[in-house]
Amino acid sequence: IRRQRQMCIRDRDKDAEEVVIMGKGIGFHAKPGQIVNEEQIEKTFRLEDKKSAGQFARLVERLPVEYLKLSDQIITYAKNNIGLKLHQSIYLTLTDHISFAIERYKKGMQFDNPLKVEVKTFYPIEFGVGKYAIRKVREKLDVELNEDEAASVALHIVNAEYDTGVRNTMNITCLIRDVVNIVSEYLNIELQEESLHYARFITHLKFLGQRIFTGQMLGDDDNGFGKVIAGMYPVEYACSEKIAHY
């Protein structure tokens, strides 16, 4: 084990995965290689991917324990209170983001998220988790983060939901924004963001974006069906062609 306040990192053996364990008094007066007292373990963080596990271990060695505790509290809230299913990588990405956000705040650097409006509109549930996160940062660390940071947290949550990279998540968000604008302008209508139809449309766009940016597009084997739709809804079909060309 390696001491770091109330936290330590343990390597079981060459075949076992690396884990981070947290608990009061863990690592106190301990020596490298010493067996950990199981009764002191309050939480075990285990990342199955070896690369992510190593990155996570190095990250928590240099950060205050409070950052990891805070990250765990936010993730637990998203899972248990909201019911989100998140990839294990969220422990690494969220803890790292919280660290940088607090560092920016302490340096007096204002962060402006260019996708804040889109995140609030297209990912309201995840944005709610982001607002919970900045509230907890304020309560626990007396650090006042803005809604732009809440939007960034939300993007990390979305990334963990769909198991895509942050860059892909941002690309998907931009795609949704642009397609919504194309539909609104081409059909000369104002989309009702509170409607069930709008929610379904956004959901379809999310999965479309995910397939596009992960290279998992579906085949186009039914041209007959497309012709039927074009005949029944010529204006809407023309709009979809404009989107396809985009």
Where is each model-derived feature located?
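Short, recurring structural edge motifs at helix starts
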Residues: 77-86, 119, 134-144, 185-191, ...
